Amino acid sequence: MNGIINLRKEAGMTSHDAVFKLRKILKTKKIGHGGTLDPDVVGVLPIAVGKATRLVEFMQEEGKVYEGEITLGCSTTTEDASGDILDRTPVTELLEEALIDEAMESMTGEIRQIPPMYSAVKVNGRKLYEYARAGQEVERPERQVTIYSFKRTSPISYEDEQARFRFRVKCSKGTYVRTLSVDLGAKLGFASHMSQLTRTFSAGMSLDDALTLDEIAERVAVDDFSFLQPLELGIGDLVRVELSDEQVEDVRNGRFISLMSEEAELAGFYKEKLIAILEKREEAYKPRKVFL
């Protein structure tokens, strides 16, 4: 069994939980996912099955789109709604929407983030959330991410000295939207947190077409595996190149092939089928991952 699944992960489960349950449903162990979602986050979780697991690194490279809600007026230990309240800065006056929009626009492009303590980023061999649960604070390494767009998508609502509004963000892999929400609040002079989040697009797949675990199980029960999408969907942003019969044989035998390209990596195709991921070595390309 080989292919890619557009899974709608529900709230309350980790990405690992989703993979574990899919292994039982599909009765196969070779399953991985293309980008972790926090337990409270709903949305697209790209799933790789069989040979497609070798494409996970390329699936993760593609940009992602999220829709969610930011709350100004209080911050939490986890930067989202699941944490304990850390600080309060009451919102006592109406806010200027133009100022919020301007602040959001100023956070686009290449930016640097410090990952939250409650995250799976490793420092000295341990995940940050392990330090956080033990009450330990450690220095967290900055990372560079790209925010392609960051827009407010609703009017501002006010309740209990807090302000809320919805947003849409398109960003690179490795972006912590929780941290983006907190940093926006800081720009506006408020403690803040991300109060809701949904991933609507990832690895070329949309939430509109995603299936839940229950829906997948129902289809498997009647031997309907049409939800398995082809490996070709998993090449991410790699440039495609069509191979000749002779080049396919060279790839099959692990030989270098000559191609007119300067790309570090290419996706080699033959008759619309993915044959190999090719890696540039000086003046030729070496088969790095072969799918024949």
Curated annotation (Swiss-Prot):
GO biological process: mRNA pseudouridine synthesis; tRNA pseudouridine synthesis
Family per similarity comment: Belongs to the pseudouridine synthase TruB family. Type 1 subfamily.
GO molecular function, one term: tRNA pseudouridine(55) synthase activity
Alphabetically ordered keywords of this record: Isomerase, tRNA processing
Reaction(s) catalysed by this chain's protein: uridine(55) in tRNA = pseudouridine(55) in tRNA
Entry function: Responsible for synthesis of pseudouridine from uracil-55 in the psi GC loop of transfer RNAs.
E.C. no: 5.4.99.25
Protein name, as recorded: tRNA pseudouridine synthase B
Record-linked NCBIfam families: TruB
Active-site annotation: 38 (nucleophile)
A Pfam cross-reference name: TruB_N
HAMAP family: TruB_bact
Gene3D superfamilies assigned to the protein according to its UniProt record, in alphabetical order: Pseudouridine synthase
